[in-house]
């Protein structure tokens, strides 16, 4: 009986993320929140170098704090990790005038948190729902805390985005989507992917894709 109880407690501990100061104890391993912040910022900066974003463009973030901890997506949301990632990205994007949209989980139909002014300017469909740890996730809660007037919208057409933990952001990035490679492949224990976009190339045999109208 004692052996069973020991194994049960050990399993519970191994699935737990405890925040002590700036250190996350994840499954018995230490992970500095500053390390998560640094990796996130490095990844974002490398993406921005290739994404050619302009002022007032929208950038989508999909993230799983569970996956960052090495756990199954949606099972172990952690608000401290969520705040670290969202605040890092939001602060950087503000510097260049780009708007952040934070995607929620499937339980909210992958709705997104944006500033109300962004929703109104882009004629986005606002929906009535509030995120929680188990429906929307830690990233959306962090966005609600960070934004001035946060709202949830059903759909956006972002120019670029970052996906931390294989949350699938493609439905919210404009055509044509282009995968971007950076030196950062993981944040914590989560797989990271990136998308930018370009206008479609249209036309047939006579179409040109550079300005040369008389030839």
Predicted regions and their residues:
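N-terminal glycine-/serine-/threonine-rich phosphate-binding loop
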Residues: 31-59, 79-92
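Generic secondary-structure signature for well-ordered alpha-helical cores
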Residues: 45, 49-52, 90-98, 144-152, ...
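Glycine-rich, aromatic-bearing surface loops/beta-hairpins
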Residues: 141, 145-215
């Amino acid at each position: 009986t004692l052996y069973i109880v020991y194994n049960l407690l050990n399993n519970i501990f191994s699935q737990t993320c405890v925040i002590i100061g700036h250190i996350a104890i994840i499954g018995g391993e230490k992970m500095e929140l500053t390390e998560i912040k640094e990796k996130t910022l490095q990844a974002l900066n490398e993406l921005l170098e290739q994404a050619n974003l302009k002022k007032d463009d929208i950038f989508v973030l999909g993230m799983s704090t569970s996956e960052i901890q090495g756990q199954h997506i949606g099972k172990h949301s952690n608000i401290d990790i969520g705040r670290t990632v969202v605040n890092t990205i939001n602060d950087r994007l503000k510097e260049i005038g780009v708007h952040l949209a934070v995607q929620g989980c499937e339980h909210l139909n992958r709705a997104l948190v944006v500033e109300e002014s962004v929703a109104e300017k882009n004629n986005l469909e606002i929906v009535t729902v509030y995120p929680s740890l188990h429906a929307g996730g830690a990233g959306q809660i962090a966005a609600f805390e960070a934004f001035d007037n946060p709202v949830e919208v059903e759909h956006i057409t972002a120019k670029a985005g970052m996906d931390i933990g294989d949350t699938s952001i493609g439905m919210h990035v404009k055509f044509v989507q282009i995968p971007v490679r950076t030196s950062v492949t993981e944040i914590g224990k989560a797989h990271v992917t990136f998308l930018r976009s370009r206008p479609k190339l249209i036309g047939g045999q006579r179409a040109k894709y550079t300005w040369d109208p008389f030839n």
